[in-house]
């Protein structure tokens, strides 16, 4: 495996050397120098391609990790990478850092631009073989330069993070470098997509840049995100915790929600990142790419007519509905292991990218809670920022009750999802498959939050609450509870009261859902919304 990786590294290095030649520098008149300018350039370039040297490259491979340049080679289209600042070196003179042995062309990060499936992207890849990928002033300067360029031309930024943190020898200059990067992250937010792929350690101040980007992915077993490491935690709180427990991929994809997905290894992560990139527009001013679609837009889906159980309390898998409706069952789920009671992700309808949001009856009956509300809100806001239409599948019995939720701030966090849907001006299509109870009905992209098209299936139950709870209030003391429940269901727990009032646009046959959505998306493609001017909104953070 290591040998194969080395071969790829050499090949990648050769391609990079070719791409970076043609600088137009002449050596005429310099023959008296011991080493010509051209030879010096070649030597510097060769040193840059080797990073921290073969010994450190081998150590990187033994950890099951690719080098910074190998990662770029796998991520980008062959021959498309145009490197910048290959000759930049750190400026630190303290602690022996001025010695030639501590100078590496390019320092500890590789930066530049390239293409993924022919589409422009800017990339930085931290090089753990050089000072552990630690961030120096020069390192930060290189990253900031490509981020500025990406904002200027309107292209995404992908960061491949593998760094031990700030370079201690540089002191405050390293901290200033982090702040410079954070500022670019904020400036670029909502302008260009920003993606972080954590492929090694990422600790201390370094963690805030991935946290500010739109999506954070991790590699299992080799990547870590934490503000303070296990040793500091032990000294301060007396907790014994491993790196993996504290900030590993499992922790951040299942417990904290900091990371959006985790992949098995570097190769798997980079291949998935290429696929994910295909769903995204280059900027907020550009449409998402359109893929040729061989899945008929008017395709009927007969299995949807029986997917919702007749028993209102029986669970089913919302993913079965999503996969059946979208193009070729291709769904890139975001945060699949976190807050599983809501499903979010990207798909295509008739070749065009859409954002999917759906309650998951298989988990907590699809109730909204703190984590699912925050997960859904962040996804909805990303889609709105980058003009990606939203399709929402609703089966929600309400917000999860209990002191843990109330003490945790479910009111404030639940309001985030409501706010996100209300704020969104992209095309919004909602399908109520079964339950839509109480305030959760309002929150899930209802007509009242300016949903463009709102459908209900015949199995929909749109009401203030479920029949049992309602009967206990309305028919308190009533002798025939079953009759009372039947009366409530007849009057309220069905799609007709909402349809009569225009709160749903139509009650549709489930099998026609794909055809109806594709047709609506075509009509809504020219949608324009004008809102009152404001400096910025104040979402309940």
Swiss-Prot record:
Alphabetized PANTHER family for the sequence: PROPIONYL-COA CARBOXYLASE BETA CHAIN, PROPIONYL-COA CARBOXYLASE BETA CHAIN, MITOCHONDRIAL
Cited SUPFAM superfamilies: ClpP/crotonase
Gene that this sequence comes from: Pccb
Source organism: Mus musculus
UniProt enzyme class: ligase
This protein's name: Propionyl-CoA carboxylase beta chain, mitochondrial
Keyword Mitochondrion: yes
GO molecular function: ATP binding; propionyl-CoA carboxylase activity
Pathway the protein takes part in: Metabolic intermediate metabolism; propanoyl-CoA degradation; succinyl-CoA from propanoyl-CoA: step 1/3
């Amino acid at each position: 495996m290591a040998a194969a990786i080395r071969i790829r590294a050499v090949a990648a290095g050769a391609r990079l050397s070719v791409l970076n030649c043609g600088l137009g520098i002449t050596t005429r008149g310099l023959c008296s120098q011991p080493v010509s300018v051209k030879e010096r350039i070649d030597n510097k370039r060769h040193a840059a391609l080797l990073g921290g040297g073969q010994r450190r490259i081998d150590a990187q491979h033994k950890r099951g990790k690719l080098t910074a340049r190998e990662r770029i080679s796998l991520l980008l289209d062959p021959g498309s990478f145009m490197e910048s600042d290959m000759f930049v070196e750190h400026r630190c003179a303290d602690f022996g850092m001025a010695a030639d042995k501590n100078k590496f062309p390019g320092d500890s990060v590789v930066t530049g631009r390239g293409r993924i499936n022919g589409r422009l992207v800017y990339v930085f890849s931290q090089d753990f073989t050089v000072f552990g990928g630690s961030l120096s002033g020069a390192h930060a300067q290189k990253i900031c330069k490509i981020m500025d360029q990406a904002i200027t031309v309107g292209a995404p930024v992908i960061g491949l993070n593998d760094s031990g943190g700030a370079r201690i020898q540089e002191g405050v200059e390293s901290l200033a470098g982090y702040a410079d990067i954070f500022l670019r992250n904020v400036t670029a937010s909502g302008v260009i997509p920003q993606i972080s792929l954590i492929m090694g350690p990422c600790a201390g101040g370094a963690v805030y840049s991935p946290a500010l980007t739109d999506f954070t992915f991790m590699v299992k077993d080799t990547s870590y995100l934490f503000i303070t490491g296990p040793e500091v935690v032990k000294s301060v709180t007396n907790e014994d915790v491993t790196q993996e427990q504290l900030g590993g991929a499992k922790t951040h994809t299942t417990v904290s929600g900091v990371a959006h997905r985790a992949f098995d290894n570097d190769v798997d992560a980079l291949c998935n990142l290429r696929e994910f990139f295909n769903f995204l527009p280059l900027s907020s001013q550009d449409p998402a790419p359109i893929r040729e679609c061989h899945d008929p837009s008017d395709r009927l889906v007969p299995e949807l007519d029986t997917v919702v159980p007749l028993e209102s309390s029986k669970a089913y898998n919302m993913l079965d509905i999503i996969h059946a409706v979208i193009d070729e069952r291709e769904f890139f789920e975001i945060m699949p292991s976190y807050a599983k009671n809501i499903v979010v992700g990207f798909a295509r309808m008739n070749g065009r990218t859409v954002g999917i949001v759906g309650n998951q009856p298989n988990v907590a009956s699809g109730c909204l809670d703190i984590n699912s509300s925050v997960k859904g809100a962040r996804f909805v806001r990303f889609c709105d920022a980058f003009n990606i239409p939203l399709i929402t599948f609703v089966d929600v019995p309400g917000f999860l009750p209990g002191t843990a939720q109330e003490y945790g701030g479910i009111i404030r966090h639940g309001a985030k999802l409501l706010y996100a849907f209300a704020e969104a001006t992209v095309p919004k299509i909602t399908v109520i498959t079964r339950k839509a109870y109480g305030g959760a009905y309002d929150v899930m992209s209802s007509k009242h939050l300016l949903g463009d098209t709102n459908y209900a299936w015949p199995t929909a139950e749109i009401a203030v609450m479920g029949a049992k709870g309602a009967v206990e209030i309305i028919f308190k003391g009533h002798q025939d509870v079953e009759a009372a429940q039947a009366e409530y269901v007849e009057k309220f727990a069905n799609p007709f009261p909402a349809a009569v009032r225009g709160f749903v646009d139509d009650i549709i046959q489930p099998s026609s859902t794909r055809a109806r959505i594709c047709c609506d998306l075509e009509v809504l493609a020219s949608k324009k919304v004008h809102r009152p001017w404001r400096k910025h909104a104040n979402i309940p953070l």
